[in-house]
Design a protein with these regions (language model features):
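Flexible, gly/pro- and Lys/Arg-enriched active-site loops
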Residues: 4-40, 45-161
């Protein structure tokens, strides 16, 4: 099984404010869809509730929750460890949030697929965990200039050393 983390991260590692993204970048959403379609996505309860249309289409959706169990279109497990037991050896799984799940998955992930945004949002209340600790090396980096209402950003793929 391949475990991947995917996130859009501002310069100060901000990823959210009031259960929404801090920057809405259309190309980032296209990349997210392209990378995750046909695979398993694993998320926490709050991340599921932040999705405008519920479960993501054309993906196996797994929600981690110890309290709620009603997540239409999703498999529900109480922990990441339990969820991983139900994913096949040849499958790709993408951790899509929230922050506590990102923290836990950083220790076991094979790849990070980050959109690194070269700006700091005016408000943020959720931050991606520190990841520049020497564990990861850059596999590829695709820079995008600021345009329209979007700040400059880069699609950066990291692989575990």
């Amino acid at each position: 099984m391949e475990i991947n983390i995917i996130a859009a991260v501002a310069a100060n590692r901000a990823i959210g404010y009031q259960n929404d993204v801090v920057y809405f970048i259309r190309e980032d959403l296209k990349r997210f869809k392209q990378l995750t379609t046909g695979h398993t996505v694993i998320m926490g309860r709050k991340t599921f509730h932040s999705l405008p249309k519920g479960a993501l289409p054309n993906r196996r959706n797994i929600v981690l929750s110890r309290t709620e169990t009603d997540f239409p279109g999703c498999d529900v497990y109480s922990s990441l460890e339990e969820a991983l037991k139900h994913i096949g050896a040849e499958e790709k799984a993408f951790i899509i949030g929230g922050v506590s799940l990102y923290k836990e998955a950083l220790a076991i992930a094979d790849h990070l697929y980050l959109t690194e945004i070269a700006a700091t949002p005016p408000q943020a209340d959720v931050f991606f965990p520190e990841y520049n600790d020497g564990t990861w090396i850059v596999e590829s980096r695709e820079e995008r200039p600021a345009a329209d209402d979007n700040p400059a950003y880069a699609f950066v793929n990291y692989v575990r050393k």
